[in-house]
Swiss-Prot record:
GO terms classed as biological process: anaphase-promoting complex-dependent catabolic process; anterior/posterior axis specification, embryo; asymmetric cell division; metaphase/anaphase transition of meiosis I; negative regulation of gene expression; neurotransmitter transport; polarity specification of anterior/posterior axis; protein K11-linked ubiquitination
Keywords associated with the record: Cell cycle, Cell division, Developmental protein, Meiosis, Mitosis, Neurotransmitter transport, Repeat, Transport, Ubl conjugation pathway, WD repeat
Protein name per the record: Abnormal embryogenesis protein 30
Function: Probable component of the anaphase promoting complex/cyclosome (APC/C), a cell cycle-regulated E3 ubiquitin ligase that controls progression through mitosis and the G1 phase of the cell cycle. The APC/C complex acts by mediating ubiquitination and subsequent degradation of target proteins. Developmental role in early embryogenesis and the metaphase to anaphase transition in oocyte and spermatocyte meiosis and mitosis in somatic and germ cells. Required for embryonic anterior-posterior axis formation. Negatively regulates ify-1 protein levels during meiosis I.
Family, similarity comment: Belongs to the APC4 family.
Acidic residues: compositionally biased ranges: 625-647, 1014-1027
A Pfam family of this chain: ANAPC4_WD40
Protein's organism: Caenorhabditis elegans
Length: 1027
């Protein structure tokens, strides 16, 4: 079948604008006169078709759950929601953002793919009435009434929870003095909360499809927000021994009960039962293999429970964001408070160490003068009051917020997770009931979805860990508060504060556990871990230390008698020195053991501390038996060696047991007092307590738990995996063969569209069974084009079958061509601009002025190749093709064509006639780079000049056919303009205009096809006046 091309004005009111950036993607809104533009730098611009600015934003700084901000991501695809309220923007990093069209704010973000998303497609679900499906259950069901009632109940079950999430931080702003959300966090939470009403009106009953450009996958997002299913194209084709060559387009249709995608494959010739719309047979249609273009339909069951699941997924991500922001706020304010607490114990000098001061004060009741001065004046009563204030005011506030804000967020996550799993289980039961009528008669109850799905199990475990860590954080706050309270009580009773000690101080001392306070001071105020270990061994492990020392002495053959003799000789030498110094007798008993200790060790080659483990580390040869009393030789330092630089100054103390909860791993201080989970009920809780008590989970910080939970939340499509984590096999409901000829090698472009889009609600096709939800497949090669309509057999009533087949045949197109020359429409020929030999109509007696207009602009009037197809509604098409000119060296030009009428055609011949735009305003043609068509008001927009300019024009709803039925336009002659000029002079009194100048202007206007403006009066009246 051939088609023809006429040249006429199909694009009116063309306006060209310069874009603020190079456009990478664009789309029209189906409900408004809006156009959205995206750039490679992440900018999105929304304008009216009149080019009035609405808003501009950048989505690179918006992150989804489980992702980071990527400054180098570009906007790869755009698509408006069916009602035009939201704009879906996909990035090159696989993130989909939903933007509010009215405000330009990002309302929802989800990680949908691993790499670049190449295309988006957002459709409405158009279901048949429920009563029309009852006949399916009347053949093989034992109890029809029970099944019908069960299905009706499943269809009409109300949502069990429609409450809105209360903002916890709003209450904290009123009565919380320490921790508050920032304004940016508050705004982020408010704008990302999608209300139930908004969800019902705009997102429910919609399916958003996205293609992963790298992995050849289709991601199905229920309600545009919930990545419910992932269709692996390669795995799906592998079921039929096909390999993917090219993926063209995708489309969701509720009439076919699934997601359709169009692809060119290579493999056996399938026996497609496309008339019945059933899966192909096991045996191939013929021997051998070849290249085929096939339409695959993957089954997707839709139920009301699935929409509730999508709403629960939104609530789940909102709860995650609320917890993350609450944790960040709590962490930031906690760090400020703990720094203030530690600053109270800073002595500001290295000579006085608060740990040594407190330890000496506890053991001996006194310390040196500098230490007492710090306790009395540096810390003082004000310092103790601040510590007590922190322990009695700030710590309870932290506990309250941790238990209130964080615990509320954690419990909300647990609740939303439970509701999410419940809605999924309800949906799974519906599918099982729909596919298997023996469900009601099984003796064994079916396994819950959460028990058989590894993704749901992981989600439950991560949220439970987060809830447990939140509870532990509150317990750690209480523990720290008690420790600081005991510390303040003890310090207040030390010597520097004895003057203010009250009478009941002794009673307080009796109630205090001195051993625990001593251990607390050693572990928190001594920064060196080796020193802490040494002191703990001396104070609390003396028996063990003595036993080890005795054992070591036996192994080293330590001679105690020889050691005592040596001590005596050293003492004698020192005694003689003292006698010589004071010239008087000196009693040996007056010598203090502490004075002898350094002298004793000075005589030894290897000084030994009898209270440490150093004696146990000596060699077998005992140094105590050596008689050499000389000083040990010191190793000379090599000149090239530099002294080791001193490390960072260690903090005076570390009292924080809570701060590590905000990190990825808990500190040793937090683990020391970390409580254990009760394992009493593990028999009914699937050993939850024992899992929580494992070392790996105990060491986890909340930040790491959040990262793991984010990774789980960002991959809900794994819900279709089995227990082993492998993707379940998807069911292909039918395969439709488009082309399978021996010479076929694929198409240049292919599109799937609805014959009657959802916004054409009053079209007659909606009243005809089968045609209202039919789809159209349009494919083209360089020199071929075809378009077919596929009707869902389940929608066609027997009495309408012949009528439907007649409509399908009339909508079918199939063209082949080599070259097609463009013809001029008759109506356009009457109004065409004058050419070189026919510039204007003149009287025989009038003088003609020839004006040189320069080189003639080439006209591209020969179609040599097709490149793109844009299906509209009811058989209308817009094609993008490459045209050549008769002039040499002009190359090719990409131009658009449009079918001149839609179905049903008033004139049958108009079906195969396309119109190419003719510029009546004299403007030159521009090569089209990217073309989009408005689906309702049929505006056209195309990019040119490397995406830096955009042209928008109005397309006529229907181009006049070739037959001339419009009134012929009367063109003015040169004499008419001369008469108008004379009358203008008489009326205005202007006589200085050059006649030649005016004649040149008239000639240029007529050559360009334009009429000069006048005062609206006709020239016939002017002639009558002259007579």
């Amino acid at each position: 079948m051939d088609f023809s091309i006429v040249k006429t004005q199909i694009l009116n009111n063309r306006r060209t604008f310069r874009t603020p950036f190079k456009v990478s993607s664009m789309c029209f809104s189906s409900q408004n006169d809006l156009i959205a533009l995206g750039s490679k730098t992440g900018e999105i611009l929304l304008k009216r078709t009149s080019w009035k600015m609405i808003w501009k934003t950048n989505i690179n700084m918006i992150q989804a759950v489980g992702t980071e901000c990527k400054l180098d991501s570009s906007v790869s695809a755009l698509h408006f929601s069916p009602d035009g309220r939201f704009l879906a923007a996909a990035t090159s990093k696989g993130i989909i953002h939903l933007l509010d069209v009215e405000t330009g704010k990002v309302r929802f973000s989800v990680k949908a793919a691993s790499e670049k998303i190449a295309k988006l497609h957002w459709n409405c679900v158009r279901e048949k009435p429920f009563i029309s499906n009852l006949g399916e259950f009347t053949t093989r069901i034992k109890n029809v009434e029970a099944i019908e009632g069960a299905i009706e109940l499943a269809e009409t079950t109300p949502n069990i929870s429609q409450e809105e999430i209360a903002f916890v931080y709003q209450r904290l702003d009123e009565d919380g003095s320490s921790f508050k959300h920032e304004d940016a966090h508050k705004e982020s939470l408010e704008r990302t909360l999608i209300s139930t009403e908004t969800f019902r009106e705009s997102l429910q009953n919609t399916i958003l499809l996205a293609t992963d450009d790298m992995d050849s996958k289709i991601i199905v997002l229920v309600a545009g927000v919930f990545p419910y299913m992932e269709i692996d194209i390669s795995d799906t084709l592998l079921q039929y021994n096909q390999s993917l060559l090219m993926l063209y387009d995708m489309h969701y249709s509720s009439a076919f009960g699934g997601v359709s995608f169009l692809a060119t494959t290579y493999g056996p010739f399938l026996d497609c039962k496309q008339n019945e719309l059933k899966p192909p047979g096991a045996e191939p249609k013929k021997d051998g293999q070849g290249c085929h273009t096939l339409l695959f339909n993957v089954k997707l069951n839709i139920n009301s429970s699935l929409w509730d699941t999508a709403l629960r997924y939104i609530r789940l991500l909102f709860g995650f964001n609320l917890y993350s922001i609450s944790l960040e706020t709590t962490k930031r304010n906690w760090e400020e408070q703990i720094d203030n607490l530690h600053s109270l114990f800073d002595t500001k000098t290295k000579a006085v160490k608060i740990g040594n001061v407190l330890l000496e004060m506890l053991l001996s009741g006194s310390t040196d003068a500098a230490g007492e001065a710090f306790l009395e004046r540096g810390l003082g009563t004000d310092g103790l009051d601040k510590i007590e204030l922190f322990a009695t005011k700030h710590m309870p506030e932290v506990c309250r917020i941790a238990r209130g804000q964080l615990s509320t967020s954690a419990r909300n996550l647990c609740f939303q997770r439970c509701e999410f799993s419940t809605s999924l289980s309800r949906y799974a039961k519906f599918i099982q009931l729909k596919d298997d009528d023996s469900f009601l008669y099984d003796e064994d109850p079916p396994a819950y979805l959460s028990e058989s799905n590894i993704w749901l199990n992981t989600l439950e475990e991560k949220i439970n860990i987060l809830d447990m860590k939140t509870r532990h954080l509150g317990i750690q706050c209480l523990t720290m508060m008690q420790e600081l309270g005991h510390l303040v009580k003890w310090i207040s009773m030390t010597k520097p504060f004895a003057k203010t000690m009250k009478v009941n101080a002794l009673m307080k001392i009796k109630r205090m556990n001195i051993a625990k306070i001593l251990l607390y001071i050693v572990r928190n105020f001594i920064p060196d871990p080796e020193a802490v270990k040494d002191i703990e061994n001396r104070l609390f492990n003396l028996k063990e230390l003595v036993s080890k020392q005795k054992k070591k002495d036996l192994e080293d053959k330590f001679d105690e008698v020889e050691y005592l003799y040596r001590l005596e000789r050293i003492a004698e030498v020192e005694r003689k020195k003292l006698i010589e110094t004071f010239h008087e007798k000196f009693r040996f008993a007056d010598l203090d053991d502490d004075d002898l200790t350094p002298l004793l060790f000075q005589e030894l080659d290897h000084p030994i501390d009898i209270f440490t483990d150093s004696m146990m580390e000596q060699n077998d040869s005992s140094p105590f038996l050596e008689e050499d009393e000389g000083e040990p030789e010191q190793e000379e330092q090599k000149p090239d060696e530099e002294p080791e630089p001193e490390g960072e100054p260690q903090p005076a103390c570390d009292l924080d047991r809570v701060g590590s909860f905000f990190e990825k791993e808990l500190s040793q201080k937090a683990l020391e007092v970390l409580p254990k989970c009760d394992e009493t009920f593990d028999c009914v809780l699937n050993e939850r307590g024992s899992r929580m008590n494992s070392i790996e989970i105990q060491k986890m910080g909340i930040l790491r738990v959040l990262e793991d939970l984010a990774a789980t939340l960002s991959s809900p499509q794994k819900i279709h995996c089995d227990k082993a984590g492998n993707q379940k096999k998807l069911e292909v409901s039918f395969i439709y063969e488009i082309t399978s000829t021996p010479t076929h090698q694929g198409y240049q472009d292919a599109k799937i569209s609805s014959v009657t889009p959802s916004y054409y609600k009053r079209h007659p096709f909606n009243q005809l069974s089968g045609m209202g939800r039919s789809i159209q497949v349009s494919v083209l090669q360089k020199n071929e084009f075809s378009s077919i309509v596929i009707v869902p057999t389940s929608d066609v009533l027997p009495e309408d079958e012949n009528e439907v087949n007649d409509h399908v045949e009339k909508l079918k197109r199939c063209y082949e061509f080599e070259k097609i020359d463009v013809t001029v429409d008759k109506s356009s020929a009457e109004n065409r601009p004058p050419g070189e030999t026919d510039a204007m109509e003149v009287d025989s007696n009038e003088l003609r002025i020839d004006v040189d207009l320069g080189p003639v602009v080439p006209e591209y009037d020969t179609l040599i190749e097709l490149s793109q197809v844009h299906p509209l509604h009811h058989g209308e098409l817009v094609l993008l093709g490459k045209f050549t000119s008769a002039q040499e060296g002009t190359g090719v030009m990409s131009q658009m064509m449009r079918s001149i009428s839609s179905y049903p055609h008033e004139i049958p011949e108009d079906k195969d006639v396309f119109a190419k735009n003719s510029s009546e305003d004299g403007s030159s043609e521009i090569p089209i780079e990217t073309l989009i068509i408005h689906p309702t008001i049929q505006l056209a927009a195309y990019l040119h000049d490397d995406g830096s300019k955009i042209t928008i024009g109005d397309m006529k709803p229907e181009v006049p056919p070739i037959a001339d039925y419009e009134e012929k336009t009367v063109r003015k002659t040169f004499r008419d303009y001369q008469r108008r000029r004379e009358r203008y002079r008489e009326d205005m009194g202007v006589m200085n205009m050059n006649d030649v100048q005016y004649d040149v202007l008239v000639q240029e206007a007529m050559d360009s096809g334009r009429d000069l403006t006048d005062n609206g009066e006709s020239d016939e009246d002017e002639e009558d006046d002259d007579i």
